[in-house]
Design a protein with these regions (language model features):
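Catalytic centers of hydrolytic enzymes
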Residues: 1-177
């Protein structure tokens, strides 16, 4: 998988470590992801990924910013009209420019895969397959990796731990550049 995306409503709390060791418990994990929803892999073209990124802003003034895995970087401009906010030249996947004609493997939760929060572009994904539960992926990620770091910054994400959660969705499925 090249990219994982999570809707902000899928993260219900910060995943803050209990102490300096970085330990977290199941209750905290459950607070972060109470739904226990399925994870879906799919194939999207680069053009479809750009379309999904643009769907973060609506003509009615609402927005729902996606939480991407660390493999995706892009800039957007709120001063641009809806449908033209993503700076397409800035979009990088694994540090390389996104190729609109190329196919990419993407993982999202089942809510997004079914056009949740108005992200209709995910319904166009090809080769969709359900492969596990989001909470279990987070537990596997936390069990296999280093302790949860304390947040250092916040930006587009609800918290820096939202990025950890998006990466956890794709644990074992992200390809290397």
């Amino acid at each position: 998988v090249d990219l994982a995306l999570l809707n902000p409503g899928g993260v219900r709390a910060d995943l803050a470590p209990l102490d300096a060791s970085g330990a977290v418990n199941f209750g905290q994990i459950y607070s972060v992801q109470p739904f226990g929803g399925g994870l879906v892999t799919m194939t999207l073209s680069g053009a479809q990924i750009l379309e999904v990124l643009e769907q973060q802003w609506r003509t009615n003034g609402q927005q729902a910013l996606l939480l991407p895995s660390s493999t995706l970087r892009y800039a957007w401009r709120g001063s641009q009209p809806v449908g033209h906010r993503v700076d397409r030249a800035s979009v990088r996947l694994h540090g390389l420019p996104l190729d609109a004609a190329r196919d990419y493997r993407v993982v999202v939760n089942a809510f997004l895969a079914n056009s949740g929060d108005g992200f209709e572009g995910f319904a166009e994904g090809r080769e969709q397959a359900l492969f596990g539960l989001d909470r279990e992926a987070l537990i596997d990620y936390l069990s296999a990796g280093p302790p949860v770091p304390r947040p250092i910054w916040s930006g587009v994400y609800a918290s820096s731990h939202s990025a950890v959660l998006a990466r956890a969705m794709a644990i074992g499925f992200l390809s290397t550049p």
